[in-house]
Amino acid sequence: MSVIPWPLKPMSPPTPSGRAQHGAAVASASAAPAGHRGRAPAAPEATAGPDDTAAMAAALMQSRQTILPKRLGAPGPNVAELAAILEAAAHAPDHGQLQPWRFVLVPDTARTLLADVFALALQERDPEATPEQIEQAREKAYRSPVLLLAVVDSARGDADIDLAERLVSAGCAIQNMLLMATAQGFGSALTSGKALKAASLRALFRLGCDEQALCFVSIGTVVSRKGARVRPAASSYVSTLDEHRGILPGF
């Protein structure tokens, strides 16, 4: 079911020939057709050393891309796969071990409630919204087999740990989940929107006064996808503090 072997199991350092064989297996998995969820070629039995582990991690991160909810269909993760995705969040950095974030699963049986909230939020923002626009807002609640709301708490635990750190932790937790979903062969996306701040949505999800709805996480089988976007080079977003010349571009 996995696109690449997972979890990783580091073993003894590989021989040059073993490394080449494993690299070919990762390349083959990365080149699989869009939406393919077949089992990847088996990795060599003998070795999976540090170099191979890094290559597999790189292949996983580089294969993750945003697949809009309208491009995600059934089947979604089964119970065991969803549990693995959710458990991945627990491995995020968390200063003070506050666990300042949580996730609310929105099953199919509750999508109508969310659709009603989306429609109401639109009408509150735009009293002149057309029936077609209202229906489009409602329809968003039914996309993707798995839908989760990410929630962050600005006050839980140590008050000296500010919101910025809590948001970083939540972002890392979400990225862990997206990477696990990618490793399982699923597509995923984060979505937001003005409805996240609506009183009706806060009431539906019973958010506390110090909590905010961060984003929705959608997961499912890729039905269609756009081409992968070109990622920026590290040199475009990294600079170096030089003791004599100040901040210099690159690293």
Where are these regions (language model features)?
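Small-aliphatic-rich amphipathic alpha-helix that forms the alpha element of a beta-alpha
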Residues: 89, 148, 154-203
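Short, charged/polar surface micro-motifs in flexible loops or helix N-caps
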Residues: 108-113, 119-120, 154-156, 199, ...
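A glycine-rich helix N-cap at a beta->alpha junction
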Residues: 138-140, 204-230
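Helix-biased detector of long, well-ordered alpha-helical tracts
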Residues: 68, 154-159, 242-251
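A structural motif
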Residues: 143-149
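Phosphate/diphosphate-binding glycine-rich loops and adjacent basic-rich segments that engage nucleotide
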Residues: 227-251
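N-terminal amphipathic, basic helical "cap/leader" segment at the start of enzyme domains
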Residues: 2-143, 250-251
